[in-house]
């Protein structure tokens, strides 16, 4: 069985991507965020360096995956880089990858809108880490090194009241996630096993989707691509304001170069928004 996972930050169309696979590829199981999702405490454990707890929980996912009688398993879960990437490759060293990249300004705004919406309907967002503090299930913890430059803490994200702080929180999460993506590809020499998607554009292009399937040597069910499936659409359109662009620029001006240098190289320089890092 071939396994494909995603390198991505979330709010990048990954639910729809899972449908593209299961609707178009023969003998394929396509999942988005299957149980165990690896959000919540596994994200906390990753930051705390507790691989053993992650490994113990991930074993349950492995057992489920191995029971599928199929040639291809695809999981488009953005928890991959947040919690279980280094453990997953222990079990699936031959895994293939899709690097799903979206404009960080829009990712941050989409995350902000989503967070506002979930708080409004009182959706249970939080969990308690092993330190007793509350964290948000689907985000980084705020304890990661990148946040220390700006004196972020988990209370800032949980007790959201400042638009600027929260938007910048999600910008930093995107930057951290992309750095993890490149580090993962370098560490495990996986560049040749990774396909890059520019979203949302590529998700709606038949030629590009076919090229991705060909990259992984997959057999399609039909000659033409079937474009259907659920999307995690928010209530608000993802419109980035001038003020939010200034919030982004402030972050970029203060971040150490070690977080920014990857955006001066491929694949990022091929994106039409790459000049925001200049």
Regions found by a protein language model. Name each.
Residues 120-148:
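Long, charge-dense
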Residues 29, 96-98, 195-197:
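Hydrophobic/aromatic beta-strand patches that form the interior of the parallel beta-sheet core
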């Amino acid at each position: 069985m071939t396994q494909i996972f995603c390198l991505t930050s979330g709010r990048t169309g990954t639910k729809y991507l899972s449908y593209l696979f299961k609707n178009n590829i023969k003998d394929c199981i396509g999942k988005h965020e299957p149980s165990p999702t690896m959000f919540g405490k596994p994200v906390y454990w990753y930051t705390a360096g507790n691989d053993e707890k992650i490994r113990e929980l991930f074993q349950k996912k492995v057992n489920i995956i191995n029971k599928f009688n199929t040639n291809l398993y695809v999981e488009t879960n953005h928890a991959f880089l947040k919690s279980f990437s280094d453990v997953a490759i222990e079990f699936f060293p031959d895994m293939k990858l899709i690097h799903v990249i979206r404009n960080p300004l829009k990712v941050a705004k989409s995350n902000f809108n989503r967070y506002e919406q979930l708080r409004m309907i009182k959706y249970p967002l939080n969990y308690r880490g092993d330190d007793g503090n509350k964290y948000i299930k689907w985000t980084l913890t705020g304890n990661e090194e990148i946040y220390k430059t700006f004196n972020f803490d988990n209370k800032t994200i949980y007790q959201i009241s400042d638009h600027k702080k929260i938007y910048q929180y999600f910008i930093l999460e995107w930057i951290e996630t992309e750095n993890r993506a490149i580090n993962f590809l370098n560490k495990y020499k996986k560049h040749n096993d990774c396909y890059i998607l520019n979203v949302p554009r590529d998700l709606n292009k038949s030629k590009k989707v076919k090229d991705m399937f060909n990259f992984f040597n997959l057999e399609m069910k039909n000659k033409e691509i079937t474009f259907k499936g659920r999307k995690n659409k928010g209530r608000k359109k993802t419109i980035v304001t001038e003020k939010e662009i200034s919030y982004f620029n402030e972050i970029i001006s203060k971040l150490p170069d070690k977080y920014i240098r990857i955006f001066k190289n491929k694949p990022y320089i091929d994106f039409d928004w790459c000049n925001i890092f200049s």
